[in-house]
C-alpha cells in the first residue's frame, strides 16, 4: 500500500478517461485499492430490490476512480497541479501545490 496525497474533501479534476475535465470533491478514499470516490463523477444507475428497510427502484451512485486518473486543483489558479509535502517553521507537515506553492487543505488554517 502506498501513501496517498489525497484526502476526503479535496477538490480534484479528472485528467484521463471518459470523465476527463470533470471537477468534484473527494467523498471517500480507498487506500488499499488506490481509488477515490469523487462527487458527481463516474455515475452509474443501479437497480435495487425493495426490502423492509427501503423501497426498490433505480438509484444513481458514484463508483471509485483510480488516483492516477485525477489531479488536485491548485487553490490559487484553479488548474490541475501535482502535490508535494513541506514542513513549516512550527514543524507541521503540509501538502503544497507544486505550481503555486499554495497550501492545500485544512492543514494550513
Swiss-Prot record:
Any Gene Ontology CC annotation: ribonucleoprotein complex
InterPro entries, A to Z: KOW (IPR005824), Rib_uL2_dom2 (IPR014722), Ribosomal_uL24 (IPR003256), Ribosomal_uL24_CS (IPR005825), Ribosomal_uL24_KOW (IPR041988), Translation_prot_SH3-like_sf (IPR008991)
Gene Ontology BP term (one): translation
An annotated Gene Ontology molecular function: rRNA binding
Keyword presence, Ribosomal protein: yes
Keywords per UniProt: Ribonucleoprotein, Ribosomal protein, RNA-binding, rRNA-binding
Function: One of two assembly initiator proteins, it binds directly to the 5'-end of the 23S rRNA, where it nucleates assembly of the 50S subunit.
PANTHER family membership: MITOCHONDRIAL RIBOSOMAL PROTEIN L24 (PTHR12903)
Quaternary assembly: Part of the 50S ribosomal subunit.
Family: Belongs to the universal ribosomal protein uL24 family.
NCBIfam families (UniProt xref): rplX_bact (TIGR01079)
Protein name (Swiss-Prot/TrEMBL): Large ribosomal subunit protein uL24
Organism: Rickettsia massiliae (strain Mtu5)
